[in-house]
From Swiss-Prot:
This is Vacuolar protein sorting/targeting protein 10. Residues 1392-1423 are cytoplasmic. It is a multi-pass membrane protein. CDD domains: Sialidase_non-viral. Glycans are attached at N313, N338, N986, N998, N1281. The chain crosses the membrane at residues 1371-1391, 1424-1444. It is found in: Golgi apparatus, trans-Golgi network membrane; Prevacuolar compartment membrane.
Length: 1504
């Protein structure tokens, strides 16, 4: 039944007459009207972010275009702009966002653009201005974080931006912004531990402990990127401890890579992601004290691929993406009561690219969930662009079972969250049982506008009926008494429709004019009779705001007889159903009652509960138990422990937990119900096991491989956040067979047996992925560590150059570049590059006739680099054409050629290095450098150096914000060597670091950074270059640097060998030209992955070499070991050995190299003692020795050939039986019985300062019999910044190191033209004269020695600014002159009267860059007075010059030591939060002092 209602506001005279008539007939009673009152307000701006104050008619909206906030006190009848009242100053045109308080309906906040913000505590009637010295964060969605118990406590998330980057920062208030205090800088925000009312209610016993607790996601201690983000907390707003305490998320230990955190009901959830995987680890707590990792069974969750949907007070619901090729489907999980174990509810849920999921629980009714799923999921999984067929399902038992929606016995499908056309909730409101949706009946969901109709249910989704044809926007009011709808098919409409009987019948009311509806809304609790409709009028080109009021529609208030007791949930028999131990009922208005609820209008409906007897559904698995695969039992997740004395033999039993517990909060009646949580008898055999032992606890497994040789192998190692225990290796043999092991070589499987493979290519950004290339076009790959294999058709043949076929994207995991020849029939074939966004599906051409193309995306370059591609292309697409650098940001729809002549380009950490011909010198080349991929700068060399295109260069590891490069001087076969040069922080200015560095015929260099340590490098140099030039063999010596190449020394030899004998060269432990330790380096390794050191075994290093004048052959070498970062070494075994680190260095293993053996040596006490383990009865010759790249495994693998038979064998060594417990660490103190703190240091510096700061690491106590079982780095802290010393500087451009350690100008070269700095930096006020020194890029030192800035001059045109900056008063000048002279004279007189008259001699020392004074006299005061006397005499002799110099000093021309400005890091927290953004660094000497080091532990050498 549909009636047309007259639009009353268009006929006021008629309305007046009608009211008078009714009034006279009823004697003044409230009269019933025939329709709603509708008032119109037209505005020029878009009404955004509409917000009702709950239980009121006060509504706000924002005009984002003008920054104005509009307010109405009468449900939208009258509007005015806020900004003219008291406390509203400055609000006009400054608003960015309106934020209601989540838990206090009287409060809301308006955030401004420029630091001024406003708060109301009386539902919008008055506003108070407050200021925060930061703009609202644009990165974080939640700009305000509310306390769940005290609504006065709020955290404000802001940002402070410079031209380079924005820094997220947090502030807090405890009194509704009456006062505001800084909290800390942060990476991804701060939040209250008590972040929800439900959390506050469930943690009352911890209220005092966590009431003020704040948690923050902050930057790493050494690494500014997301992989190192940490979760820290403080109970004192970081006043007692500026960095805070790191939260122990995983088994009592911190976790790195925190990317997100969220509070839901009584839970806090934190997501973490490690480098090398897209899998996330989710950690959950329900008390902010104890954390657990959430378990999703065999399902993995990925970044951007999970959505926390909501939850109850007893569970969390999470949707996890379940397809790798498409973002379009997921799996719905529900947790147990503590949020740790998740149960799969339904698969193939419908998702969109933004992560929204078609899921909504029916508000106010426990256990009813409505979801959309993809019916043709198999097709969608196979084809990324397949059209989805979506169907709707509903659950009435908390997601345990699902069934179709039914409308007149037909399946109904409704549009949900991913296609929602209004604001607020999609289907339901607090009105009990009333549910609406737009959809269609049939086999699957169809078009919203073409096929959609409005359907309604008044029994919480059990049955549905057609309400209105065509799609409509809809809202519910007065607890379900009124439903309002407006057609929403894209065409203008001039009417609304409403129902007052649960959608059975509909009436119509006319609008003033037609609009295209934008949104329809009412109060959040759906209790009001007033609605707000906003739409756009195409006729007036304005926005129309309609206030719709139904208060006069019924003349009476509902009585008791107008209500019914409505059961919120029914079982399959139609009876009230139990959930969480009770049945739920609502008292709601009958659908045909002709009344409105006015007395309790603004009261949200509350349910009534009736208890049920306990059933199996009221129980869940207890702590440390998980569901069995058939879901019928709870089995132990960790080994059980029997009561002391209970188990004497395996045949005994003991009383133990059943594995079940009653769900916390469950109200079921225990008497007469199920009791699954009663203790049960458990067998002792489940808890008894053999005790750990010595070498007998080690096991070995031998496997024979049918092939002539191992061709290559790679570990597909799980990263820290990846769940699983497998240790997978993929191996290719010389005959093209592919073998896979998932248990570190204990068993092997021959995969894809009918295919011959040529090459394995790993994705360097995702450890789970590997590609297996053939000579054909069909290629194979795995995305799950070789559990399964898939294939694609390549667009061209494989590139004949190894490693050049496939390129991968750092951020978008399915983006790839393929470079290879097409239909090549001759030798010199052109190669083309193609790209795909779908992991091999849908290849498109990038460029033809290329050498290579690469993605340039990198986190440090920002989102601007996500689509950036570099190609080295032949000019005119001719194979013989000149090479040129071509770049594009749109897959070469458009392109640029920044460098028309190049040789090659390569990536090295944050740098892009391009080699190009030198236009001024034939056969020579130069380098260009870029950090952002857009701006290029010429590289300059500080020595008389010509880089020959014929001789070549090698680009080395770059992990300390500078580039190391080897430039070849001699390219004769077996006689190659060259110069090691090092850049400044932007890669443009190179200085000599070390001469005569050894290079192999293949272009590799004896250069290696000790992993995990800052600035420690080992290199081999050719000591007899003159003889080598004449054809003699090279003699190599090993050099080491502890300050990133600024100073090099020989390695100190041990005093005695492993047998306790002294060395023939007679050294006392100090290195000399005749006696030092020399190590075989990178160029001699069979496997370049066998590095000296391990990033996880901090400070431990192995090497094979000898003590003497130079390096001898491996046949005469021994194996040496260092436990202090290469400062001191000892011989541990005679002969050459392979080595590996296990469990982060708690197990060290050696096996003989180059000779038959059947045993290994191992140490569990950092190399102090060694034991022997025999792994085989037969001897083998070891070809390689390996373990997982992170060195965290307890398994090792020997790759060998059996002696006498030439059979290939692999031998697994399993050390896991050596110990039976995990080490305990107290992160707060950093130490425990199982751990001690270790600090790296420089051998010539005191106080363990290294690069301006002191680092602390956890190292396992060698005496503790436990396992680290930790995949994260062991950094404990990075403490105070140290004063600058000589070791914090290196030689500047055009300067070189002298024999005494100082830096001097290279003979024949001019001083750098320092004034060029002003030209390159037009806003610069001053420049500094060259001193010969520059700060090492990674140092963070402050104060102390100032070797790089002595004398400054004003830049042209900035004289006045310079004088203002350095101007001083006359008093300062006076004291600057008089006081030093007075002190010098007085001190000189005292020395003259007390000293014995014996002068000493001054020499330049090597320790700390200080001058040391030695004296033959016995006076203890001589070290100071000598300098003072020298100063006094000098002052007398050159007094006129002194006055001039002092004048310049006082007026700023001479830079005073210690006046470098504010400390770059005042605290550890400031150090940790520094951003590593180099995008806008120009070609100058700006060293970006103090930036954190970012270790790329897998940075292999690039060579050309």
């Amino acid at each position: 039944m549909t009636r047309q209602w007259l639009h009353l506001t268009t006929s006021p005279l008629l309305l007046l007459l009608l009211l008078i008539t009714i009034s006279s007939l009823t004697g003044g009673a409230v009269a019933k009207s025939d329709g709603p009152k509708i008032a119109l307000k037209e505005v020029e701006v878009v009404p955004e972010q509409p917000f009702y104050f709950e239980n009121t008619d006060t509504v706000l909206f924002l005009s984002a275009a003008t920054g104005e906030v509009y307010r109405s006190f009468d449900g939208g009848l009258e509007w005015h702009v806020i900004g003219k009242g008291e406390g509203e100053e400055g609000l006009t045109n400054d608003a960015v966002v309106i934020l209601p308080h989540k838990y206090d309906n009287k409060k809301a906040y308006i955030l401004g653009r420029h630091g001024a913000h406003w708060v109301t505590t009386d539902q919008g009637r008055t506003w108070r201005r407050f200021e925060v010295p930061a703009a609202p964060s644009m990165l974080l969605y939640e700009r305000l974080r509310f306390h769940g118990e005290d609504s006065r406590k709020v955290i404000f998330m802001g940002e402070r931006c410079s031209l380079v980057a924005c820094l997220e920062t947090a502030f807090y208030t405890l009194d509704d912004f009456e006062t505001v205090a800084p909290l800390r800088d942060t990476a991804r925000g701060c939040f209250w531990a008590v972040g929800t009312p439900a959390f506050a209610e469930s943690t009352t016993e911890y209220a005092k402990e966590i009431g003020d607790r704040v948690l923050c996601i902050v930057h790493g201690l050494k690494n500014p990127f997301a992989a190192a983000y940490r979760l820290v907390y403080s109970d004192s707003f970081f006043k007692d401890n500026e960095d805070g305490i790191e939260a122990n998320l995983n088994a009592g230990r911190p976790v790195a890579g925190i990317i997100n955190a969220a509070a839901r009901t009584k839970y806090i959830m934190v997501a973490a992601k490690s480098q090398g995987t897209d899998e996330l680890a989710m950690f959950v707590t329900d008390d902010a004290i104890t954390w657990h990792r959430a378990e999703f069974g065999n399902h993995k969750i990925e970044e951007g691929a999970y959505t926390v949907l909501g939850g109850t007070n007893y569970s969390i619901q999470v949707d996890v993406k379940n397809t790798d090729r498409s973002e379009s489907m997921g799996v719905l999980f529900t947790s147990n009561s503590n949020g740790t174990y998740f149960t799969r509810n339904i698969e193939h849920t419908n998702r969109n690219m933004e992560g929204y999921v078609d899921f909504e629980d029916i508000i106010g009714v426990q256990g009813i969930v409505l979801v959309n799923v993809v019916d043709n999921w198999e097709e969608v999984e196979k084809k990324f662009d397949a059209d989805k067929k979506v169907i709707s399902k509903i659950s009435f038992d908390d997601g345990r079972t699902f069934q179709p929606l039914k409308a007149n016995d037909k399946d109904l499908h409704v549009h949900s969250v991913t296609d929602f056309q209004n604001i607020g909730r999609v289907f339901s409101s607090p009105a009990p049982g009333i549910v609406l949706g737009v959809g269609n009946t049939g086999s699957h969901l169809k078009s919203y506008t073409k096929d959609g109709n409005l359907y309604v249910s008044d029994d919480a989704g059990v049955t549905w009926r057609l309400a209105l044809e065509k799609p409509h926007k809809y809202e519910i009011g007065n607890k379900g008494a009124v439903i309002v709808a407006i057609k929403d098919d894209g065409d203008p409409t001039g009417k609304i429709q409403f129902s007052i009987n649960h959608g059975k019948d509909w009436d119509t009311a006319e609008l003033d004019h037609k609009i295209i509806p934008f949104y329809l809304t009412t109060t959040p609790d759906s209790t009001s009779l007033k609605f707000l409709l906003v739409g756009f009028s195409e006729e007036s080109r304005k926005w129309s705001i309609f206030a719709i009021d139904f208060e006069g529609l019924h003349e009476r208030e509902c009585k008791e007889s107008d209500f019914e007791e409505w059961p919120a949930r029914l079982d399959e028999k139609g009876e009230p159903d139990c959930l969480m131990g009770h049945k739920q009922y609502y008292r709601r208005r009958k659908s045909d009652a002709d009344c409105f609820i006015t007395e309790t209008m603004f009261k949200t409906p509350t349910p009534e509960f009736k208890a049920c007897k306990c059933t199996a559904e009221d129980f869940e698995c207890d702590y440390n138990f998980v569901r069995s695969e058939d879901r019928t039992k709870c089995v132990p997740a960790t080994p059980l422990k029997a009561p002391e004395g209970a188990c004497k033999s395996e045949d005994d039993t003991f009383k133990g937990p059943s594995g079940w517990r009653l769900i916390p909060g469950n109200a079921c009646i225990r008497d007469g119900g199920e009791e699954l949580d009663k203790e049960i008898d458990r067998p002792c055999k489940d808890v008894l096991k053999a005790p750990p032992g010595d070498a007998k606890a080690i096991s070995s497994t031998v496997n024979y491989i049918e092939a002539e040789m191992f061709k290559s192998f790679y570990y597909l190692e799980r990263a820290g956040s990846s769940r699983g225990e497998d240790e997978t290796i993929v191996m290719l043999t010389s005959n093209g067979k592919l073998y896979v092991t998932h248990n570190h070589g204990k068993t092997w499987t021959h995969e894809l047996t009918d295919v011959k493979f040529e090459e394995i290519v790993r994705n360097p950004y995702l450890n789970d992925r590997a590609f297996f290339l053939t000579n054909g076009k069909k290629q194979f790959y795995t995305i799950n560590r070789a559990e399964t294999f898939e294939s694609f058709t390549a667009p061209a043949e494989k590139n004949p150059d190894p490693g050049m076929t496939l390129g991968f994207h750092e951020i978008y995991k399915d983006w790839m570049i393929w470079t290879g020849p097409s239909d090549c029939s001759h030798g010199n074939c052109p190669k083309d590059s193609y790209f795909t966004k779908h992991r091999g599906d849908g290849w498109e051409i990038l460029l033809r006739a290329v050498i290579n193309c690469e993605f340039m995306a990198q986190e440090s370059r920002g989102e601007e680099s996500n689509n950036l591609i570099f190609c080295n292309q032949h000019e005119a697409e001719e194979v013989d054409g000149q090479r040129m650098l071509v770049t594009s940001n749109d897959f070469f729809d458009t392109s640029k050629t920044p460098l028309p002549r190049i040789i090659a380009f390569a990536k090295a950490s944050e740098f892009i290095i391009i080699a190009k011909p030198d236009p001024e010198k034939e056969h020579a080349m130069k380098f260009d450098v870029s950090v952002d991929g857009v701006t290029f700068a010429d590289a300059e060399y500080s020595v008389n150096l010509e880089v020959s295109m014929e001789l070549g260069y090698t680009l080395l590891q770059s992990t300390t914000h500078s580039v190391f490069m080897h430039v070849t001087l001699n390219d004769q076969r077996d006689h190659q060597y060259g110069l090691l040069i090092k850049s400044n922080s932007n890669g443009t200015s190179y200085v000599l670091s070390l001469s005569d560095v050894n290079r192999s015929n293949d272009g590799y260099v004896d250069f290696e950074k000790l992993q995990g340590l800052e600035g420690v490098v080992i290199a081999n140099v050719v000591s007899n270059t003159k003889d080598v030039e004449k054809g003699s063999e090279k003699k190599l010596r090993t050099m080491i640097t502890h300050n990133d190449g600024a100073q090099w020394t020989l390695i100190p030899p041990p005093v005695k060998d492993s047998e306790g004998k002294g060395y023939n060269c007679g050294s006392d432990g100090k290195p000399t030209d005749k006696c030092a330790l020399h190590l075989h380096g990178y160029t001699e390794r069979r496997d370049s992955r066998n590095t000296f050191a391990s990033a996880s075994a901090i400070g431990l290093s192995f090497g094979v070499g000898n003590v003497g004048e130079s390096l001898v052959s491996k046949a005469d070498a021994s194996t040496f070991f260092s436990r202090d970062g290469g400062i001191s070494w000892k011989e541990v075994k005679k002969g050459s050995h392979f080595w590996e680190y296990g469990d982060q260095g708690s197990v060290l293993v050696l096996v003989a190299e180059g000779k038959p053996t059947r045993e290994v040596f191992f140490s569990t006490d950092e190399g102090d003692t060694w034991e022997v383990y025999q792994f085989s009865e037969k001897e083998v010759t070891v070809l390689d020795f390996s373990t997982v790249p992170s060195d965290t495994s307890k398994n090792f693998l020997i790759w060998a050939r059996e002696a006498g038979s030439d059979k290939l064998v692999t031998i697994n060594l399993d050390f896991s039986g050596l110990r039976d417990r995990t080490c305990h660490l107290d992160e707060d103190t950093g130490e425990s019985e199982d751990y001690y703190i270790w600090e790296p240091k420089h051998p010539l510096q005191e106080g363990n300062c290294l690069f301006g700061h002191v680092e602390q690491y956890h190292r396992k106590n060698p005496k503790s019999h436990c396992w680290n079982d930790w995949s994260e780095a062991h950094v404990h802290s990075i403490s105070h910044n140290c004063s600058c010393t000589f070791q914090d500087y290196e030689c500047d451009y055009n300067y070189e190191r002298q024999t005494d350690g100082s830096c001097a100008l290279v003979p024949g070269l001019p001083k750098p033209n320092a004034i060029e700095y002003c030209k390159e930096n037009p806003d610069a006020v001053e420049y500094w004269e060259p001193t010969g020194y520059r700060r090492i890029p990674i140092t963070t030192c402050t104060g102390g020695k100032n070797l790089d800035q002595w004398i400054s001059h004003p830049c042209p045109g900035h004289q006045e600014e310079y004088e203002r900056k350095h101007g001083v008063s006359g008093a300062v000048i006076f004291f600057a002159i008089i006081i030093p002279i007075a002190i010098a004279v007085a001190a000189g007189y005292w020395v003259y009267t007390h000293w014995d008259g014996k002068f000493g001699q001054i020499r330049l020392g090597e320790g700390g860059g200080q001058s040391f004074i030695t004296s033959r006299g016995d006076s203890p005061f001589i070290t100071i007075p000598v300098v003072i006397i020298a100063g006094t005499v000098a002052a007398v002799k050159v007094l006129p010059l002194l006055f001039m110099s002092l004048w310049r000093s006082a007026s700023g021309y001479v830079h005073l030591p210690g006046s470098r400005g504010p400390r770059p890091y005042a605290t550890r927290g400031a150090f940790a939060s520094r951003r590593g953004d180099y995008t806008n660094v120009v070609d100058d000497e700006d060293e970006l002092l103090g930036d954190d080091e970012f270790e790329d532990e897998e940075g292999d050498e690039e060579r050309s």
